A protein has these predicted regions:
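Regulatory N- and C-terminal appendages and interdomain linkers associated
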Residues: 137-197
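Glycine- and acidic
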Residues: 63-75, 134-142, 166, 170
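Alpha-helix capping and helix-loop boundary segments enriched in small/acidic/polar residues
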Residues: 43-47, 69-72, 76-79, 116, ...
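Catalytic activation segment of kinase domains across protein kinase-like and atypical kinase folds
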Residues: 18-21, 94-99, 103-152, 158-162
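Conserved ATP-binding subdomain of kinase catalytic cores across diverse folds
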Residues: 1-69, 110-112, 152-153
Length: 197
């Protein structure tokens, strides 16, 4: 991850201008977003969802294999996505990072968040702090980031409902809170330089 500032002034219609401009360089394990599944679901491209699930299994979730059942594959990938995104949220919160716009196009199913938009690091704990000037309701505020992640994962569950039963989707989503709090504890202890408590 790096930011290279240019000498140019940037004019934008959706943000105060002119502003300083920069190029953001980032690396991600994948660019398969929750929004990718939403689009396929919207157009009822269930065969393509199946292909994408198999692609994820072969390339990004190599510990998850199920040649016999697409249903089991979908359930396991969904569960792993919930755990990985909960882990990312724990790291983000402990670092004091405010993403700015946590929507389904900014979550990879492999657990990373990206396309940070108007991101910031907070100087002191403030759950209502927002990085985006347009976020008047605090939808993407520092304290609501885990809620935004759970909402995005709910959309992923809805996108996979042809393959996963509703009760399994709900049970899987219910694991987010536990995984998130485990991540918070782990990263807090690491940051403080103490053994896990």
């Amino acid at each position: 991850f790096s930011i290279i500032e240019t000498a140019e002034e940037l004019q934008r219609n959706d943000e105060p201008s002119p502003t300083r401009s920069a190029v953001l360089v980032r690396r991600s394990n994948s660019h398969i977003r929750i929004g990718t599944f939403q689009r396929l679901k919207y157009f009822k491209e269930y065969d393509n969802i199946a292909l994408l699930l198999n692609h994820l299994s072969e390339n990004y979730f190599t510990n998850i294999k199920s040649k016999k059942s697409l249903k089991i594959l979908a359930e396991n990938i969904f569960l792993e996505s919930v755990k990985r995104i909960a882990e990312s949220m724990g790291r983000i919160v402990i670092a004091g990072f405010v993403h700015g716009v946590l929507n389904t196009d900014n979550f990879n199913v492999t657990g990373e968040v990206f396309d940070y938009g108007p991101w910031r690091f907070i100087e002191f704990a403030n759950t209502s702090y927002t990085a985006a000037y347009f976020d008047n309701n605090g939808r993407y505020s520092f304290g609501r980031q885990p809620e935004a992640a759970l909402w995005a994962l709910t959309q992923l569950g809805k996108s996979l409902d042809e393959f996963i039963e509703e009760n399994i989707i709900i049970e899987t989503l219910n694991q987010f809170s536990k995984s998130f709090h485990e991540s918070l504890k782990k990263h807090f202890c690491w940051r403080m330089g103490i053994q896990d408590i």
